[in-house]
């Protein structure tokens, strides 16, 4: 990728919120977010802490860290990871609220936390809000989270980059299986060769 007028991400500021997959825990602390910044000559803010949850419990939760981001700094796209930690820890899913009032969302549930993040980011930065999923792995809990995310997206008019339900994307051959360090975390090669081009195309589409 080069910095040309045909690259809609060039010169933009992208904010990424997440946990170990956004951080790049199996890739030396570099993930697709970093590679998108380099390849597209855009600035990124990567707020990612391994092991953290959407559900608002403690100072490292997604919401706690979201509130520490600079509200006055312009963002062109806000991207949030649908955390696998909430599924692994079996956090309560909750229900989609009838309200659009952030103060009424139950952020001790996955749904309430996702709604809060979507509402907050949209209100603060007035930019496209994106949630992305992991590719498919064995988890009934995460499958339910993805289904609920699509319903939340319809309510809030946000974008879902859904690797979970992309059968072609998830179908790795024997050699490509080395792109995953485990069932959840990509390797550096996995980010570079597999995730980054996919995410780039989805993010490009938001600005064209």
Where are each of the predicted segments found?
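Conserved SGNH/GDSL esterase-like catalytic core that processes O-acyl groups on lipids
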Residues: 10-15, 21-104
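A short acidic, glycine-rich active-site loop
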Residues: 99-110, 184-186
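Catalytic His-Asp segment of secreted/periplasmic serine-dependent ester chemistry enzymes
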Residues: 134-208
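Active-site segments of SGNH/GDSL-like serine hydrolases
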Residues: 81-85, 115-149
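Short hydrophobic segments within beta-strands
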Residues: 17-18, 132
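Helix C-cap/helix->beta junction micro-motif
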Residues: 40, 124-125, 156
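Catalytic phosphate/metal-binding cores of nucleic-acid and nucleotide-processing enzymes, i.e., regions
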Residues: 2-10
């Amino acid at each position: 990728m080069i910095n040309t007028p045909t690259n809609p991400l060039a010169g933009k500021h992208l904010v990424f919120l997440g946990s170990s997959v956004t951080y790049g825990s199996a890739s030396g602390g570099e993930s697709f977010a970093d590679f998108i910044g380099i390849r597209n000559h855009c600035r990124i803010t990567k707020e990612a802490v391994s092991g953290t949850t959407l559900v608002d419990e403690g100072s490292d939760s997604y919401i706690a860290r979201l509130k520490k981001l600079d509200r006055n700094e312009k963002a062109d796209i806000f991207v949030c990871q649908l955390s696998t930690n909430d599924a692994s820890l079996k956090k309560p899913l909750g229900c989609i609220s009838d309200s659009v009032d952030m103060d009424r969302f139950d952020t001790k549930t996955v749904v309430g936390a996702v709604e809060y993040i979507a509402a907050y980011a949209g209100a603060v930065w007035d930019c496209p809000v994106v949630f992305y999923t992991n590719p498919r792995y064995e988890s009934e809990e995460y499958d339910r989270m993805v289904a609920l995310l699509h319903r939340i997206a319809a309510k809030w008019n946000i974008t879902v980059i859904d690797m979970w339900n992309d059968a072609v994307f998830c179908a790795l051959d024997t050699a490509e299986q080395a792109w995953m360090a485990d069932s959840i975390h990509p390797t550096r090669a996995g980010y570079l060769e597999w995730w980054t081009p996919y995410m780039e195309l989805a993010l490009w589409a938001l600005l064209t």
